[in-house]
């Protein structure tokens, strides 16, 4: 059974069998494949705790996912900080509260291990995602994204720096 008695999708730990469906949802949402990204993500998911990757399932089908976890002192961020790396919901199931259900389940699990702050990165020109995270109480933080587009190569660097304001 993949829905509870109220018809709400079941949230569970992501399993290796979910990978193809997660990638399919990501392609539907973004409009392009990201094989290198997902290869790296699934390698990390396998090494992290079970709270770091969840899926929402309805009628035996994965309809959404969230990947995140607890800081391991990346960028000097302490362990009481949680991250949302990636969240996606099949377009056919969007605007039905699935992403909020996934987010709530993950944050409840993160709180149990001492996380009291969640961080994510969003493109400033993505109003839908910004509105979603704003509706969950997110606001601008102290981290900034620095980007360098080198004219001599195709390498793009993203550097994150903590501002001491």
Regions found by a protein language model. Give the residues of each.
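Conserved acetyl-CoA-binding loop-helix of GNAT-fold acetyltransferases
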Residues: 89, 95-108, 135
